[in-house]
């Protein structure tokens, strides 16, 4: 027996009703009777629809994967060799798969990675997969940028938040000029 909870009414239904599709028609379809659907009022005119079949659903989202193209994604084990021991400056971008602003600046970062070529190495570090680095460098907002030169953080190089490609270029050029790598 299922219930539909509205702002002031509870209805009990035990009769069979037409089925409801539980996924998009482009994928395999599992059909559930409408009687297995529970609607709960969350706020005025907003409803949360949940299936009470007891089965757990998982969904893979291709948009949640960070694709780096020319930018290498590194972890804690590669940080020392890639960033601290690098002969050239390294711009580290801390990102997360769930971070909207990180996804927003992705094309600009890719373009700048190609543009700077051998003057600058750009790497990404996943926030969720590398908690020790996040704590060590006190990363509180995403995306978060830190420039490293000769194994040390360049003073004043920290920046966080999404910015335009032009502003990113201005930021990087300013940093490279301050460490005499232009």
UniProtKB/Swiss-Prot annotation:
Residues 1-67 form a transit peptide. One of its GO terms (cellular component) is chloroplast stroma. CDD domains: TRX_family. InterPro entries: Thioredoxin-like_sf, Thioredoxin_domain. Its main location: plastid. SUPFAM superfamilies: Thioredoxin-like. The keyword Oxidoreductase does not apply. Residues 68-177 form the Thioredoxin domain. Predominantly expressed in leaves. Probable thiol-disulfide oxidoreductase that may participate in various redox reactions. Belongs to the thioredoxin family. This is Thioredoxin X, chloroplastic. It comes from Arabidopsis thaliana (Mouse-ear cress).
């Amino acid at each position: 027996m299922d219930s539909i909870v509205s702002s002031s009414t509870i209805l009990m239904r035990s009769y069979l009703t037409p089925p409801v599709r539980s996924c998009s028609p482009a994928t395999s379809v599992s059909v559930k009777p409408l009687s297995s659907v529970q609607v709960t009022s969350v706020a005025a005119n907003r409803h949360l629809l949940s299936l009470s079949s007891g089965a757990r659903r998982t969904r893979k989202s291709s948009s949640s994967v960070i694709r780096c193209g020319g930018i290498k994604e590194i972890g804690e084990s590669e940080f020392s060799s890639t960033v601290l021991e690098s002969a050239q400056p390294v711009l580290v971008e801390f990102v997360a798969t769930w971070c909207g602003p990180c996804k927003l600046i992705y094309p600009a970062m890719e373009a700048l990675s190609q543009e700077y070529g051998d003057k600058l190495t750009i790497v990404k570090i996943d926030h969720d997969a590398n908690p020790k680095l996040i704590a060590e460098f006190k990363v509180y907002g995403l995306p978060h940028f830190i420039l490293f030169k000769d194994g040390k953080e360049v003073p004043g190089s920290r920046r966080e938040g999404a910015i335009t490609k032009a502003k990113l270029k201005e930021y990087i050029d300013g940093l490279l000029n301050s460490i005499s790598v232009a």
